[in-house]
Each structure stands twice: as C-alpha cells, then as structure tokens.
Regions:
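Short, acidic Ser/Thr/Gly-rich low-complexity loop/linker segments typical of extracellular
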Residues: 700-708, 785-798
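Feature captures outer-membrane beta-barrel proteins of Gram-negative bacteria and organelles
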Residues: 163, 191-204, 224-238, 373-387, ...
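Short, ordered, surface-exposed loop/turn motifs in non-cytosolic proteins
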Residues: 58-81, 689-699, 770-785
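Extracellular beta-sheet/turn segments enriched in Thr/Pro/Gly and aliphatic residues
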Residues: 140-145, 347-351, 738-759, 826-845
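Transmembrane beta-strands of outer-membrane beta-barrel pores
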Residues: 149, 178-182, 205, 214-218, ...
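Short Pro-Gly-centered beta-turn/loop motif in secreted/extracellular proteins
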Residues: 87-96, 316-322, 708-734, 746, ...
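Post-signal-peptide, soluble extracytosolic/periplasmic N-terminal scaffold domains
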Residues: 2-8, 13-17, 25-276, 593-666
Length: 845
C-alpha cells in the first residue's frame, strides 16, 4: 500500500509540513508542533513526526538504481535507516553488507575493520572518503568510493559472484512445418511434414541438450533422427566450458570436425565486451593527473582519467578492420601529448596476455553413414603477445593407429598502416586407402596466409585469405577419413583463395567477392560476385552480378563430366510507404539468368499490431521465358505462447499451401510456461497475478494468465536488464518494482522476480470511534496481507490503499503505545467502481 496525494487541501497541508521541516535552524532548534494540524481537524492528537521534522525520510526498503562513482552497477532492493552525519544532519543511509561491497568491486580484504553488524550492515564511513547519497525521488543510490579502494576492473566487468546458475528446469523447443503441394501438370497432391525437438534439462550448473528431427511425406517416409546429444557446464577457474557428448571442434586453427567425446574449451563470453576480440594495449606516461582520449577514424572511442606516472589501457572495445589509434594525453595544466598506435586485425589475433584454447578427445562422426570413424585428439591454443603479435598452433592425431597426425604453427601480426597478417604452416602424416590397399605414410605441407587492410582515407576495406597445399601428399583429417569410407569419392584440394573487398563511393558502396578452389584432379570451382548498394532518403536500391564456374581440366577420357557455369544479374528496390501505410514497404526485384529467363517481382511487406509482432508479405511475379505469372502471400505472428506462420504460393505448374508453428515449453518449480522459440540462455519473468504485462524491448512477449513470461534469449555472463511495461495494465495490478538485472551463466534459466500488489484500490476515509479523523501521518498496514506495503494517512483521515482483498482488516498506528493504534474492518462493494478506485468510509476501533 502506498501514500498518494488526493486533494488540494492535502497538498497544501503536506507542502506546509515539508517547508516547515526544511527551514534551517538559527539560534534555536525549530520544532513543528503536530497540534497545529488541528486547524482543519479538531481533536487530532500528537503524532510522532520527529523524523520528518529533522529533515529525514521514511525508513524502509526501496528498490534503487545503484551507482558507484557514476557507473551503474545494479538495481535491487536496499534497506535504509535514518542516520545523523558529522554535521548533525539526518538522512537515509543504506544497509550494505561487506559481501555486497565486495561484489561491487570494493577491496574489502584491505579494510579488515569492515564488519557486518547484527542487522547485516557495515559502516561505510570506515572507508575513508566514502559517501552514500540517496535520491528518494529518483530512486537512485550514489556511492562515492575512492579509486584506491576499488578493484581496477575493465569496463563492463562482471564479478563471478554475480553469475547466476539459474533454476532447475525442463526446456523444450519445438518447430513443426508442413506443406501441401499440388502438381498441376500431373494433377497430383503431396503432403509433407517436418518437426524438430530440442529438449533440455538444467540441474544446478549442468545442462543436458538434445536435437532430434522427424520427417514424414506422402511416399511413406517416416523417420526420426538425433542430430546431437550432450551435457555441459562451465568451469569458472578455466574461463571455459566442459562438454561431453556430440559437438564440433572450433575452426580457429584446424578445420572444424564433428565428434562424439569430451571437450574443454575457452569461452570468450566470460570476458567483458571490452576484453573480447583483439585491440592493442596503449601504454604511455602522464606527467600529472591527466585525461587520456583515444580516437579512431575520426571518432572518440575511449576516454579515461589516469594519475601521474605510467599507465596501460587494455580494455578497448574491438572495432574490427583497422585504423590507427590517435592518443591524446591532456595534463592538468592544459598541455597535451600526442602519439599514434597502429591497429589492424585478422581473426586469429588475441589481446596481449589472453589465451584461447581447446582440448578435444573423442571419435569422429558424420551424418554420412558410409563415412569412416576414428578415435582422435586435438589440442589448439592462441596466445596474445606484446606488440600486437599472436602465436598459435595445434596438434591433431588419430589415437588407435597411425592413420593421421598433423601439427600446425603460426603467427598473427598487427602491422598498423600495412594492415594485419597471419601466416601458418601445417605438416601432415597420413595413410590413405585406395580400394583395399593402405598407403605408406605420406608427408605433406600446407601454407595459409590471411591479410586484412582498411584504408580509411579512401573508404576501402579488403580481406584476402589464401590456402595453398604445396605438396600433393598433404591431407586434412576429413580427407583421410573419406578414403576409408564406403563412398571413397573425395576432392583433394590443392589451393583455395578467398577475396572480399568493399569500397565506399559518394553514393553508396561497391563490393567484390571472389572464391576459387582447385583440386589435384585438375578440376576447379570459381565464384565471383559484384554489387552496388545504396540507401537514400530511406529508399534502398542495388544491383548485383554473380558468376559461378565448375570446370574439369583433366584429360581422363572416361570422365564425361561437363563444365558448367551460371551467371545472374539482379536489381532490387525497396521504398517505404509510411506516408500512406505505416510500417509498409513496396519492393521490386528483377533477376536475369544466363539461360535468358528474366523474372520481375513486385510486392508489399510490413508489420502490424501495437508491438509490430505481425509481419506480412504479398508478391506477384512474371517470368519472360514461360510467359507466366506467379505469386505468394505469407504472414508470421510472434505471440506470447508461440510463433505461427502460414502462406500460399502458386506458379504455372504448382500450388503450395504451407504452415508452421514454433515455440518453447518451460517446466519449472512454479508450473509450466509457454513461450516463443528459446535460445540456449533464457530469463523467466515471475510477476504473480500480473497478467498481460508486456516485457520491454521483446516483440510479442507478455506475461501469461498467471503472470509468467519467458524472455527467449539472454547474453551469458553479461548483465541483462529486464523491465516491464506498466502502461495500460489492468486496474487491479500494481508492480512494486519493474526492472531487474541478471547475469546468467551459459544455458541457464534465470528468474526475474517482481513483487506485485494484486487487488482493489481504494481511497479510504478513516475515523475513530469519536468520529474524528485518524491523525495525519499515521501508518496503515494490512493484517490479512502482511506483505503489502504500508501507507500513510493524509489530511482529513484519507489514505490511499492498493492491493486490497474483497474484505479484510487493517492496522492503523500513529504512536508507540497501544493507545496510539486501532483496527479497521472493511468490505469492497459487490459492484466495484468503474474507475477502479473505491471510495470507502470506515471507522477505526
């Protein structure tokens, strides 16, 4: 229950009260006599207003945003007590435990005098210079703590003490799609259905996951398959994950392969964003207390204050690409130092001192039932050295025999103005199988080079990655396994080149992609793409060209494989129609292929409903080759309980009706909650009784009829803020707090619990048995719902109460003795007020 100002007369009385309480003392202590309230209310007795008289506020628990040195750290409930400061001023001070201070980065071990009192509170004044200021109106608690008492954590650092393993739960993601195809030429109708299920179980820090699929069609196919099954958990001290079951190896060093076994690998999501990816360490020396500013490509990307002496900045956000860093040190006397730190990056580069690792032991696996399997082990590591250098390498080997061994060593370099480069070499020792004959050990080498460069002055960015297998006897592990399979046809790659280039121009940008791969059997594949795209006045348009060639240059007369190539050019335009139809776009696409067929497609697409959770599309097309039209219409609804989609399409030969539903099921201690499709890490919203409340920034996610909802994705090991939108909620619902911050571990189901006040709202006029109003400032609390917040009595005995039951009893107190209290029995009328607020007159006895 909460106090609310309801009448002008009440507002005047309260204003007068607080003005009187805020007047500074002159020669004597000012005292506000509560009997002065008797002007309007004869018989009002002496009410204890000493706290307000001294400039204090009501003690209790407040939901506050906590800031340390102007940096937001958490939102939570904190208990406050009125305490006197050194200058004898009364103010609300927080009850903070030693554990909370440690969680927020205070070096509590350096201050042994910090201890919790019997109420679990410590004396913040024991930290020299520490000050707590509470803004009651803004619900903000500011803690000013000397820098020397704080751990120097990188930006957005989250201590492991905040990590939440979540609740025990059963999860199920499901997807079902179906279609009915009618072949006009053969007058035949076929039906097909597909489903996938992704069940999971969370128990403590352990996660069990499975992925299974089902296929059914009119030809009688009815099959279940399991794509993977594994259990996992995080290992905090290794900053990594343990996985046992079916998974894939990372592709940082060797090519990724599927396996069944055990894997321990680093998890970079455990790092704050400012420590992920690659960025150089900036070192310098400040002559005095100074401000350091870092700029890249004309933008300020970092600013901090440093004391006099040497400093190192190691928590720059990775910006991608390249572009030198311009550093300015502004001294306290206004003088400045300037220097440049070269910066560029390729995928393998790691921050100085950071180790990325993977250890896998298991058995290879493949969806191809004919593929051979081998026990194997793989170990890879990448380590960031000083000077923008990264050393990396790995070993990969079969265990039960000498079928395959490989070792790789390489280095990555930040070359500054010259870009970024990585170079590695792999040695392999292989025994391949030809027919029934296993070869002797074949030794081969492969060199790989990757390069990236961003030329800011011309707006050019390009990345080239070239693989060259220098000897014919080099094999990757999967190449060797292919020779042992029942279907022994495989392509033995000789070299591969990838090129990606983009160039900004006055209006838009031009892009170029090139992929070329050739094999030792003299076949090769080439793919080329060129495009121009631009957006002007919200109108997007572009033109793209693609070319693909599969060529066979071998001299094998028995091989009747023909060269094949394909060329396509397309034009696309998208125009917003907000002036006529909000959230709607008109589109046009033209596609012309080498065979002479040109298709033109026009359409409308957009979103609808208040939360934009209904997307729709209508298209009509024409083919010049067949001189026939085609079309389709589709819609997708993102609902609280599931996503539903459907569509219909047609052309000269086929009519197709398709439909689908995707969603999630979460079984937890408080029951069962349906949701949209869930990611691996999710948040359960618990607001008991608050039905139909939207979750901010989550399309279509509202609380269900019990007050529960699932936020279908969350960032593991990072702070996730979940807030509820209270605009338009039902009149009998009150949310005591609306925002929570949570830090889930990977795969966790964390619960965001909101305290609710469900019930009737009333403006209650309280009188005593002598028919005089209950004293101003008295507190009102529920005897039948003790969890409800207390309220205060205003002028003329008026109290604003929320969360009331149909009938109940209230306790009213205005002093410390038994004579200073009474009880009220009330009943809400059988026909509630249309406004949602009841006006009640009750006697307190």
């Amino acid at each position: 229950m909460q106090f609310s100002r309801v009448e002008p007369r009440s507002q005047l009385a309260l204003s007068f009260l607080f003005i009187c309480c805020s007047i500074k003392p002159a020669l004597a202590h000012d005292h506000f006599n509560p009997l002065s309230l008797e002007n309007d209310e004869p018989g009002v007795e002496n009410v204890d207003l000493s706290v307000f008289e001294k400039g204090g506020q009501a003690e209790g628990t407040y939901n506050v945003d906590i800031y340390i040195n102007n940096t937001s750290v958490e939102t939570k409930n904190i208990a406050f007590k009125n305490k006197k400061s050194a200058d004898n001023k009364l103010s609300l001070q927080p009850c903070l435990s030693v554990e909370q201070l440690k969680q927020w980065g205070v070096k509590t071990e350096n201050f042994p005098e910090l201890k919790n009192d019997p109420n679990g509170c410590t004396d913040l004044s024991l930290l020299a210079g520490a000050v707590a200021k509470f803004n009651v109106i803004g619900n903000r608690l500011d803690l000013a703590i000397p820098q020397i008492a704080l751990i120097a954590d990188p930006r957005e650092f989250v201590p492991t003490s905040e990590w939440d393993e979540g609740i025990n739960a059963f999860l199920l993601n499901y997807s079902f799609t179906g279609s009915q195809d009618h072949d006009i030429d053969e007058n035949r109708t076929e039906n097909s259905e597909y489903a996938n299920l992704r069940p999971g179980i969370n128990i403590g820090a352990w996660r069990f996951r499975n992925y299974s699929t089902w296929n059914h069609d009119s030809d009688g196919q009815n099959s279940w398959d399991s794509a993977y099954t594994y259990v996992s958990r995080d290992i905090e001290f290794l900053k990594g994950q343990l996985i046992a079951g079916e998974n894939n190896t990372p592709a940082d060093v060797f090519d990724s392969i599927s396996f069944k076994g055990v894997q321990i690998s680093s998890d970079d999501d455990m790092l704050p964003d400012s420590m992920k990816g690659f960025a150089p360490v900036i070192r310098g020396v400040a002559k005095s207390s100074a401000q350091v500013t870092v700029e890249q490509n004309g933008y300020t990307i970092y600013k901090t204050n440093v004391p006099a002496g040497p400093f190192a900045i190691n928590d720059l956000y990775p910006t991608g690409g390249s572009g030198d860093l311009y550093v300015t040190i502004k001294e306290s006397d206004g003088s400045e130092q300037h220097f440049i730190v070269p910066y560029a990056s390729v995928p393998v580069l790691q921050r100085e001192g950071h180790l990325k690792y993977d250890l896998t032991v298991g058995r290879t696996r493949s969806s191809d039932t004919h593929s051979a399997q081998q026990n194997f082990a793989e170990l890879t590591a990448l380590y960031g050295l000083a000077g923008g250098i990264t050393a990396y390498g790995g070993i990969e080997s079969t265990l039960s025999n000498d079928v395959y061994h490989a070792a790789l060593i390489g280095t990555g370099l930040n070359l500054g103005d010259l870009g970024a480069l990585s170079l590695d070499v792999t040695n392999s020792w292989s025994k391949i199988k030809a027919g029934d004959v296993v070869s002797d050990t074949l030794t081969g080498q492969s060199w790989r080079i990757r390069y990236s460069k961003d030329i800011q002055s011309t707006g050019t960015n390009f990345t080239v990655a070239g693989y060259r297998y220098s000897t014919k006897d080099y094999y990757a592990l999967e190449d060797v396994l292919d020779t042992y399979s029942d279907n022994s046809h495989y392509d033995h790659v000789r070299n591969r080149t990838d090129l990606s280039l983009s160039q900004d121009i006055i209006y838009g940008s031009i892009s170029l992609t090139l992929y070329n791969e050739d094999y030792w059997n003299d076949t090769h594949t080439t793919s080329l793409g060129i495009g121009y795209n631009n957006t002007r006045h919200n109108v997007s348009y572009g033109i793209n060209y693609s070319y693909t060639l599969n060529a066979d240059n071998s001299q094998d007369e028995d091989d009747d494989t023909e060269d094949s190539n394909d060329q396509q050019i397309s034009i696309n335009i998208s125009i917003p129609l907000d002036a006529f139809m909000p959230s709607t776009y008109a589109t046009y696409n033209m596609n012309s292929a080498k065979d002479g067929d040109t298709t033109h497609t026009v359409g409308l697409n957009g979103t609808a409903l208040a939360q934009k959770n209904l997307s729709w599309s209508v298209q009509e097309g024409y083919s010049s080759q067949e001189k026939a039209t085609s079309g389709n219409v589709s819609a997708t609804y993102n609902g609280t309980y599931a996503d539903i989609n459907g569509g219909y399409s047609y052309d000269n030969h086929m009519r197709r009706l398709n439909y689908g539903v995707q969603g999630g099921v979460l079984l937890h201690r408080n029951g069962l909650t349906l949701s949209q499709p869930m990611d691996d890490t999710i948040i359960l919203v618990k607001a008991p009784g608050a039905a139909g409340v939207p979750v901010n920034n989550e399309t279509g996610v509202d609380t269900d009829f019990r007050g529960y909802a699932v936020v279908p994705y969350a960032s593991p090991y990072h702070r996730n803020e979940v807030s509820l939108d209270t605009t338009g909620i039902r009149k009998n619902i009150e949310l005591i707090d609306t925002s929570k911050t949570l830090v889930p571990t990977r795969g966790a189901v964390v619960r965001a619990e909101y305290k609710t006040n469900i019930g009737y709202k009333a403006l209650m006029v309280l009188t005593r048995i002598n028919n005089l109003p209950v004293p101003f400032g008295a507190t009102v609390s529920s005897l039948t719902k003790p969890d409800n917040h207390s309220s205060f009595v205003g002028d003329a005995g008026q109290a604003w109460l929320t969360g009331l039951e149909k009938q109940g009893r209230l306790l009213v107190k205005w002093g410390p003795t038994a004579a200073d209290r009474c009880q009220v029995s009330y009943r809400i009328p059988s026909s509630p007020s249309a406004s949602g607020v009841e006006i009640l007159h009750e006697q307190c006895q």
